Structures are given as C-alpha cells and as structure tokens.
Amino acid sequence: MLTGITRLFSRVQKLDPRCFLHMSVQATQNSQVPAERPRTVSRTSDSDPAKHGEQHEGQHYSIPLQDLKTVFPHGLPPRYMMQVKTFGEACLMVRKPALELLGYLKNTNFAHPAVRYLLYGEKGTGKTLSLCHAVHFCARHDWLILHIPDAHLWVKNCRELLQSTHNKQRFDQPLEASTWLKNFKTTNERFLSQIKVQEKYVWNKRESTEKGSPLGEVVEQGLTRVRNATDAVGVVLKELKAQSALGLFHLLVAVDGVNALWGRTTLKKEDRTLIAPEELSLVHNLRKMVKNDWHGGAIVLSLSQTGSLFKSRTAYLPHELLGKEGFNALEPFLPILIPNYNPKEFESSFQYYLENNWLQHEKASTEEGRKELRFLSNCNPEQLERLCASL
C-alpha cells in the first residue's frame, strides 16, 4: 500500500500544477465568485536581525541591497536570486528555528570554546536561508565572517587541480581558492588592515609576507598569484583561528553543506583513483576551522542534500549525511531542525507571492487555489516556490 501511495504522489508531482486550478462547471453556472477580503502580506520594517523576536515570526524582512552585495557577494541560492531580481528586493522570512539560533548567537560567551550549531531538515525546507539569516545578523554586528556558501563545490567538478607545493600528499584548487578569497575580502575588508599575521610566510624565492604584516597582504597574494591562492586560504584560516581569542574580533564560521567535508569526491588522481576529501588542501584546512578548539566566536553549519554525492535523496538526519566519521568529528553539536512551513508561515509566503504578482493564474488567489497549493507543496518552501513560479 505504501508503494502505491508513493507512486501516486510522484505522479501528482509530475502533473502540471495549473491543471489543479481548474474552473469547475458549478462555478461557471453560479454568479461571480465573491472577491476575497484584501490581505496585507506579513512584513516587518526591522531590517536588523538583532531586533527580530517571537513577535516577528512568519514575517518577512528586507535585506538592504548594499548588505546583499557585501555580506553575500557570492550570491544566494539561484532560485532565490531570481526572485530578488524579479521583485527588486531581497526578503527573508523570520522563522522560529532562525530565531532560536539568533538567540544563541546573541548570548555567545566568547571566553568559552566555540559552540557548533547544526541546521538540518528535509530537502527544500530553508536551511541555507536560515543560515544566511544568522550570517546577516553577525555581519551587521561587526563579526568577522568566514562563510563557505557551498562546500560541495570544493569536492566535485573542480576546474583546476594541482599537487600542493606545501604538502605533496595533498591537492590545491587555486581557482576555487581565489574565488573564495575575493568574496572574503569583500565581506571583511575593514578587518584586513587591523589583523596582523603572527608568522613570516614565504611564497617563493622572491616573495614573502613578513611577521606583523596586515592579513590583507596574504589575501592579495592569493588574488594576484592564483597559484598561491590555496596556501593563502590556509594562512588566513590559521591566523584567524589563532587570533580569535585575543578579542580583536568576533569570528563566525558558517559552512553550508558541511557534510561534503566527509563525503566522497568526484575528483581523480592521475591514476584515475578518487581523491579523498582530506587530500584536498581546502577541505583539510576547513576541517580544522569547524573544530571547537578555539575561542571568540561561533560555528554555524548546515547539512545539504543538494549537491550531496552518493547519498539517498531522502536522507536528511545528521548521522545519515555526515556518516560515522563526520558525525564523530562534529560531536558535540547543538542540532536545530528546519521544518516545513507551519500554517502561519505558509500563509505569509502565499500572500508575499500574491503581493508581488508571482501568481498569475486566475484561480490562484482563491481559497480553493490556496488549499491545492498547500496540498501539492506539502508546505515545503522549495516546492511551494516552484509551484508558484509555474503559475
């Protein structure tokens, strides 16, 4: 019976959602459908995440476009960015799990080891945007942001792979490293002249960064000498971790798709054998940053099925996506479940799409249309967005 239900649901998903928003015969025979009372989309004017509380749950807040450029220079999920471009604004919903996370971050004890917060949930529930809500909070309150927007990009489809000059057992990814350095500089430029490196770093026979030099010189080395970009990333992470307890800055380590650090890669050596994640210099250094053996900040991680390699599409629990090695490496952590929309959140999202004329079908704004969208999407944020986009 379960198999039959599963097949039925999969067929429903494949149908054109417009066919469900039908014009019934009875409706055409009756008088004109009475217009529904106007509703105002649930919004808050507070664009500062620090001011968000339980009273804002389910409301949308606007990320200033300037913040979008500096805090998220790499962009946000593609379909979300399509909405930003279409609507001319970047709005995030204030959700209960994000409020829980913000509460923890507001009360961070910087004298204690960094706490690891792990966002998990089924596919499409909004883990990435909840993580971005936390990143925006920290950026607005002068934290130094070390953000990896998609760790899976480091373990597959690498554009260039070189043997490490620092360690012959590992491999460098200069293009991925230089891209990350560019975005890191955009977000944290005000810190790069203040933080001084604690060691001398030799890049080649002619170039070196002297002890006491601004950290920005290391970043520039990676940007101007792309071959050194991977080593530059390693130096940046090492220096930030070593200096985080000095009180010069508060450090947020945010990694989306952290399960990629302990999964399998698609990258191959010259003998055609697969490269293990720990053989990649970027992964090796990032694993050090998600350890809780440093002070002066917090670690916010998310699990992701999107882009995950060789994992079941239905897997979403930490032990399923991290595996034994990854789970043991991150334990202890504080898990935060990101669920599907509750009724209030669904209604807020639905009204937001209506307000922005994202729903063009004539029956979409009716109670019948609302119920069918709720049924088809199962209140899953990603599925709701995809259904609404096709209407």
Curated annotation (Swiss-Prot):
It comes from the Eukaryota. As a component of the mitochondrial small ribosomal subunit, it plays a role in the translation of mitochondrial mRNAs. Involved in mediating interferon-gamma-induced cell death. Displays GTPase activity in vitro. The keyword Ribosomal protein applies. It catalyses: GTP + H2O = GDP + phosphate + H(+). The modification N6-acetyllysine is found at residues 168, 200. Keywords: Acetylation, Apoptosis, Hydrolase, Mitochondrion, Ribonucleoprotein, Ribosomal protein, Transit peptide. GO terms for biological process: apoptotic mitochondrial changes; mitochondrial translation. Residues 1-17 form a transit peptide. PANTHER family: MITOCHONDRIAL 28S RIBOSOMAL PROTEIN S29 (PTHR12810), SMALL RIBOSOMAL SUBUNIT PROTEIN MS29 (PTHR12810:SF0). Its EC number is 3.6.5.-. GO terms for cellular component: mitochondrial inner membrane; mitochondrial matrix; mitochondrial small ribosomal subunit; mitochondrion; nucleoplasm. Residues 45-59 have a biased composition (Basic and acidic residues). Its main location: mitochondrion. InterPro entries: Ribosomal_mS29 (IPR019368), Ribosomal_mS29_met (IPR008092). It is found in: Mitochondrion. Residues 30-59 are annotated as: Disordered. It is an enzyme of class 3 (hydrolase). Belongs to the mitochondrion-specific ribosomal protein mS29 family. The gene is Dap3. This is Small ribosomal subunit protein mS29.
